[in-house]
């Protein structure tokens, strides 16, 4: 099932075209025991061995990707543009620019793999201790963007674009480690302490590896600004921020850009980013700037509710206070919930019009079944039974059945759409990966 557009693949991945998941680490030998595990209550579960911990946390990682793609405004935008590209350019056989519109979203994922630079692998083994700086660059294919530089003293170790891939992978990592922590907390005291220490060691080992910068960049940046957060607090805080950013409407992103433009020193490139945000793109820049702004927020006396303890104890309350005090201080009447509601309805209507095309039914069923419950609880607080999911491929094409599965035969779904999938894949491989953007020279006003 290997495709051009997919999440990072260590032990599994989600295919961005079909929204299918493959667990590439395991085959049919784990099917029976895993399907039994998936029916258990995660709030009381205790892992009996390393395999149980690995497979459950891996599944929570991958279904986070699926849910981000099928329940958030960003995911609905991505899939709506994908389906319009299929309808208007592939099925109609017309030479239209629908692929360029689709690539607005695709490119914001792809910039990580296209532009990341590792300059010194010998010094890139302790990234968390590195000094971080950021600067803006212009790329002829992707436009203006933010690069994060890692330094060991004066030596540049790595330069990493801040991308949508980092948001998606950080959200999945949060789910993966939070489910491990939850189950460890169900253990007896002595074993619990050992398990939590091993989980923390695994996490900070991940943070220090340059090979996993798509996973660890946001955590490193957040931990450096809020060093007092323990692991669970850090994971939940990052998840709260990412969930919020993934569900921003285009109007909200545009509104936030009016504040962000005043925070950018390099106005030549910064104004081009602001222009991009004014059309609802570059939402990953919102996350980057929010982390910096929140650091400023908690250190300013003019605000009443900027209690840093809320980041630890109730990050949703902290985010709400940050929006109501800090953002609204600079942007009057910022809260635009009605814009999100309207945008959501537009995407749902678009999917309903394409109901027989590729994965429209899958996206609609997931969104209508899962979006509400995910607005009330974190994924790691939910059992697999609570969520409507597609079944999952294992590495030998056997199928891992979800206990509350969407009524789609994934093998048949893949085979029926194989010609279409291959044509999409070919088009993406044979055309330049390009984001339609405004050149900094052409920005007249923001």
Q: Model-found features: residue ranges?
A:
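An active-site-proximal "capping" alpha-helix that borders the catalytic cofactor pocket
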Residues: 167-180
């Amino acid at each position: 099932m290997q495709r051009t557009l997919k999440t990072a693949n260590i032990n599994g991945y989600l295919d961005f075209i079909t929204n299918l998941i493959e667990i590439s680490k395991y085959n049919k030998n784990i099917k029976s025991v895993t399907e039994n595990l998936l029916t258990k209550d995660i709030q009381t579960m205790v892992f009996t061995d390393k395999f149980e911990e690995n497979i459950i946390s891996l599944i929570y990682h991958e279904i986070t990707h699926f849910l981000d793609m099928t329940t958030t405004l960003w995911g609905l935008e991505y899939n709506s543009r994908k389906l319009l590209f299929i309808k208007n350019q592939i099925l109609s056989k017309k030479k239209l620019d629908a692929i360029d519109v689709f690539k607005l979203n695709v490119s914001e994922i792809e910039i990580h793999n296209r532009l990341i630079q590792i300059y010194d692998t010998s010094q890139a083994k302790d990234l968390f201790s590195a000094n971080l700086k950021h600067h803006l660059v212009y790329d002829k294919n992707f436009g203006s963007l933010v690069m994060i530089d890692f330094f060991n003293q004066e030596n540049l170790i790595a330069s990493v674009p801040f991308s949508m891939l980092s948001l998606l992978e950080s959200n999945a990592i949060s789910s993966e480690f939070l489910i491990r922590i939850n189950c460890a907390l169900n253990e007896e005291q002595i074993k619990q302490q050992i398990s939590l220490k091993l989980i923390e060691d695994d996490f900070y080992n991940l943070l220090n590896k340059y090979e996993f910068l798509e996973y660890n960049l946001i955590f490193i940046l957040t931990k450096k600004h809020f060093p007092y957060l323990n692991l669970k607090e850090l994971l939940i805080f990052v998840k709260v921020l990412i969930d919020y950013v993934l569900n921003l409407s285009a109007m909200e992103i545009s509104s936030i850009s009016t504040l962000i433009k005043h925070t950018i020193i390099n106005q030549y490139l910064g104004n081009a980013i602001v222009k991009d945000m004014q059309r609802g793109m570059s939402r990953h820049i919102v996350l980057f700037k929010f982390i910096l702004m929140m650091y400023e927020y908690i250190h300013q006396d003019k605000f009443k509710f900027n209690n840093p303890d809320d980041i630890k104890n109730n990050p949703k309350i902290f985010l709400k206070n940050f929006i109501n005090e800090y953002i609204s201080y600079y942007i009057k009447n910022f809260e635009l919930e009605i814009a999100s509601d309207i945008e959501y309805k537009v995407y749902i209507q678009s999917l309903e019009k394409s109901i027989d095309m590729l994965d429209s039914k899958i996206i609609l069923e997931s969104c209508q079944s899962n979006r509400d419950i995910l607005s009330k609880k974190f994924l790691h607080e939910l059992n697999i039974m609570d969520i409507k999911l597609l079944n999952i491929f294992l590495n030998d094409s056997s199928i891992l059945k979800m206990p509350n599965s969407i009524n789609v035969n994934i093998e048949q779904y893949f085979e029926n759409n194989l010609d279409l999938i291959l044509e999409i894949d070919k088009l993406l491989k044979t055309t330049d990966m390009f984001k339609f953007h405004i050149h900094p020279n052409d920005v007249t006003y923001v």
